Amino acid sequence: MNIFEELKARGLVFQTTDEQALVKALTEGQVSYYTGYDPTADSLHLGHLVAILTSRRLQLAGHKPYALVGGATGLIGDPSFKDAERSLQTKETVLEWSDKIKGQLSTFLDFENGDNKAELVNNYDWFSQISFIDFLRDVGKYFTVNYMMSKDSVKKRIETGISYTEFAYQIMQGYDFYELNDKHNVTLQIGGSDQWGNMTAGTELLRKKADKTGHVMTVPLITDSTGKKFGKSEGNAVWLDADKTSPYEMYQFWLNVMDDDAVRFLKIFTFLSLDEIAEIESQFNAARHERLAQKTLAREVVTLVHGEEAYKQALNITEQLFAGNIKNLSANELKQGLSNVPNYHVQSEDSLNLVDMLVTAGISPSKRQAREDVQNGAIYINGDRIQDLDYQLSNDDKIDDQLTVIRRGKKKYAVLTY
């Protein structure tokens, strides 16, 4: 099975320009290819991971990746299938975000070894050197307005309004392809399926300006089996930056993937062989309640993104919280595992009587209910049941001198911080 056949078997090929020519190029020699990442935030997220891992697969097959950080295009904003124009960021912010994204990409691509080691480029380096007049003369003349208006990504915005700034975005992305081809002999661009219009602007410019053929391959935008856009947890993006989405939160995200999606996601997001995945699928279908596919998915992706130690920690947090063994976890581990739990910062004037604190921290709705909860054995401090109505919280209840975990019943948690 050649690399293109494997990508197809994994569900990673959505659309290509001349497929036969692309397969020929990928199977007959080394291809230099690029994927672009606009710094629209200070971190990449799971939605970027499909293209990143596809790039890694191609590198492992011997091809040479260029990771383009859009320091210039990030200042403009891509209109593709957006309902409204993005708010523009300052140059300083975009350049800062660009540097952070560069660091994240080095986790996935090999920038050190071999004749196909990855290269990082930033389109700010060339766009900052070209004048507006030169750009219109040397690039703009190759694009007709009719051609630009025909793009689906533009059509969807015409009725609501699109600025010239965003309208010109496709020409800028097209010029990226031309520049990388001219300087580095890059002949293939990879991106999400929503980028097709912008990407083919690059092949059009290559054809008209340099009489060369470029290839484009898009990866699918991933949705779950209900059609919901992939990569969000409770409406929030799942970030690759551990400070924005902890390894534990990422682990839980994969662990909660629906059965109908789990095997498909193993093909897309892991480097397990297709034979290994087929074996996992067989075991998974025989005992779905054991969630083997989800557990494997969580292990593989968290290890890939954050490393084996982070995976082991996420697994340990999961197991200890499930067992109620709060004291077996450090304060930092509890902050990860209970990040979505109500948090109350204890004030110096607060009463440390347990009944009072249950009301103050919003765990029980009233003192009467709080007393009943304590007497009925429904209140736990750091995993220990407390039934003393006169119990006073003390330093002994502080884990690592930072926090106390209170549980009411089986599932209602609150964290006291000091």
UniProtKB/Swiss-Prot annotation:
It comes from the Bacteria. One of its GO terms (cellular component) is cytosol. ATP binds at K232. It catalyses: tRNA(Tyr) + L-tyrosine + ATP = L-tyrosyl-tRNA(Tyr) + AMP + diphosphate + H(+). The lineage of its organism: Bacteria, Bacillati, Bacillota, Bacilli, Lactobacillales. Homodimer. A motif ('HIGH' region) lies at residues 39-48. This is Tyrosine--tRNA ligase.
